[in-house]
Structure formats: C-alpha cells, structure tokens
C-alpha cells in the first residue's frame, strides 16, 4: 500500500464499480462489491457508478459499508428509451440493446471524471454488457453475472460470428466444438442479442465491439465456483491468454430479504406460511423480474398446480399495461387453492424462500441468479428456460450437474397441465437422484465460500492483484 507523503497515512487503492442497470445484473455485482469492501478493508476505496434513478439499489450498500461512495452521472438520453427510464426493468426484453448503446455515451463523462479526480481509480470492474469500459485508460475487469459456460459461448459467438446455413431455419443446431463438453443449441436458443445483430449498423457494431472487448479485458470475475464450473473456468483462462480469471461465487446477499421492489405479501407472512408446512413439501414458482407469462401459459400453470395437490408459493409478475396476450391469474384461483397455495404478486423474498426447510422444488426460468440461489439452498430445480442464457443454464443444471428436471421450455410454449401436475407431485416425493445431487452441490457451494475455500481464495487473489496495480502506478 502506498503512503501519502503529506500525512504519512497509507493511500487506499481506488476501484470503480459500474453495474448494468438491470436487476439480474446490478444485484450480483453490488453483492460482490459488498464482499470486496468487507474483505479489502482498509486497503480499498470503492466508488460505484449509478444514474440518479438507480441510486435506491445502491443505498442499502452505502449505509452498510463505510469505504464505498457513489458516483452519480446523469443518464444519457436515447431516442428509443422513454424519458425517465433508467433501468431495463422498465423496458420490454427488447430494451437491452438500447440500454447498452445508451450507456456507451457515458464514455466522455467517465474520462473527464477519471482525469480530474485527485486520486483516480486504478481499475474498473464493470458488467459484461459494458465491454467498452476497457477503453478508459485503466485496467478493466469484466464482471459476469452469468455462468462461466455462458461467457465461453458469448465469446465464441461474438468473435467467430457463426451463421445459419439455412437463414429460415431457427431449429438449426449450432455447435461449439472448442468449448469443453462440446455444447450445442438450436439457433433460437442462443443469445437474442447475437441473433438480432445487424452487420454495418453503428449501434450493433458498437455492441459487437463491446463484447469483443470482454475477451481483451485485463481480467474476468465470475459468479461461479470451481467445483461447479472448473472446466469452463480453465477454458476461459486459455481463451483470454492469462490466469486473471477469478471465480468468486456463489455470490449471495449478506442481508436483506426484500431488495427487489414492492410485494403484495410481507416477508414475515411468507415465512410464517412456510413454517406451517412439512420439510421439502413446497414447490416455489418464480420466473424472475422480466418474464410475464402469456394468458395461456398462466392458465396452464395454474391448472397444473391445482391438479398436482402440492403446496406451493407462486410469485407472479403481472403486466405493467393491459395486454390481451398476457394475462393475470383468473379470479377465484386463490380461493380454490387456499390453505395449500400462496400467490405473491410482485417481488418475492426468493433467497429466504429457497432456504426455508419446507421448500423442496423450484420451478424456474433458469436465470443465473436464480440457479445460484437454488444451488446454495440445495433445492431441486424444475427448469423452464425462455431466453438469453437460460437454455445454457438449464442444460448445465439438468445434463451436467444433474440437480434439475426439465418441466418445459420456450417463451411461447404452453405446457400440458397434466404433465406439469405430475412433475410437481414427483418433485416433492421421495429422494430422487437429482435431489441428492442438489444437496451435494450445496455443500460444495458452501465450502467454496468458507475460509480457505476456492472462492474466498480467488477473492483474496483478486484484491491482492488490484492492490498491486495501485502500487505499480
């Protein structure tokens, strides 16, 4: 640690954190920042960049840790983003590329802030949607809120730019022979960002270059752990040409059960409801912060839950606006399942629910945060991937880790209610191989974040490396 010559006190190593404004991206990076601040202690000074309307996501962290401060920059306007919108949660799924492109306009303000700062950051840790931050004149660490295998696939897509043989066939299989286990997916199951790419369009060329900058960044931090994805972490090191890849997961909240937004049911009520149920007898249903089921899917899922006879908690994201193709749960459902079903409209205290002894299975869209939280809880996953990296996550969960069972797949698929009912009933009875594997993986996950565990060692290694960057300036 350097010493300030004026007061003879050690100079802290300054690190800038830049989350991407979407719940599934902000939450894990802010949780990582919390751990970084606690573990780094007096060695680190941390600044977190947010736009004004995203400050509430950061506020709990600012009140919990003293060596973190905010950098609030105005949101850069974009012609296709409504005025006042600064987070992807207020946009349809198609809003991701708009947000990526808009945030690229923070390059000049960031350069100005860095060059004028009396003690500028020696490094930046930014979300993998913000690859352009590699070009700020300081070492940039790519933070992946997704699985290591997803990083492998995204790198291959944006560097090699594979295309379909038959442009009209979305069922065509895309192979990744250079990646361990040679994964393959239908073309409609790979990144929608990649599938939407338009050659020569300036906005899309910016996004392509940004993803390519991830591979060329100084280092990579992944929300995973060696026992779960070691083979993919080693592949990333070979691909990037160095060992500056740190697996610091599972990144889980140190506190807070209701960080994501308003909910129709209090956390205390949810916990009391679960307390009255037997161990491993409740199915938890949640599709994350972005997915709104179609009316037909909602009806099929409600029917499957009703027919199954299982106890369940269903966290429902309802449409922001009236939409004839997307429906709410029909009136009367709550009454028909009263006593064995609890419907939460809005944000659910997912971490607390999954960790409760009564929860035995989790119907999930396979967003990586949800997968990680289920792994830490040791809960059997029932997979229903719909988009983005969810197909990759589902394949990892079911085919490789064997801690899940397929329930359905696809954003528009309407499942058979009777088949869903069978899957639900089977998931909370007996000791399936998948349930046993889930318990074993939970132990490996918890071991990784214990003192001298693989992820704690990687976190310490990351901190030491960042501090060394400050010493060498």
Swiss-Prot record:
Active-site residues, Swiss-Prot/TrEMBL: 25 (proton acceptor), 127 (charge relay)
EC number: 2.4.1.91, 2.4.1.237
GO MF entries: flavonol 3-O-glucosyltransferase activity; flavonol 7-O-beta-glucosyltransferase activity; quercetin 3-O-glucosyltransferase activity; quercetin 4'-O-glucosyltransferase activity; quercetin 7-O-glucosyltransferase activity; UDP-glucosyltransferase activity
Signal peptide: none
Keywords: Glycosyltransferase, Transferase
Residues involved in UDP-alpha-D-glucose binding: 348, 350, 365, 368-370, 373, 389-390
Matching Gene3D superfamilies: Glycogen Phosphorylase B
Catalytic activity: a flavonol + UDP-alpha-D-glucose = a flavonol 3-O-beta-D-glucoside + UDP + H(+); a 7-O-hydroxy-flavonol + UDP-alpha-D-glucose = a flavonol 7-O-beta-D-glucoside + UDP + H(+)
Pfam family, one: UDPGT
Binding site for an anthocyanidin: 25, 388
Record-stated family: Belongs to the UDP-glycosyltransferase family.
Function: Possesses quercetin 3-O-glucosyltransferase, 7-O-glucosyltransferase and 4'-O-glucosyltransferase activities in vitro. Also active in vitro on benzoates and benzoate derivatives.
Designated name of the protein: Flavonol 3-O-glucosyltransferase UGT89B1
Biological source species: Arabidopsis thaliana
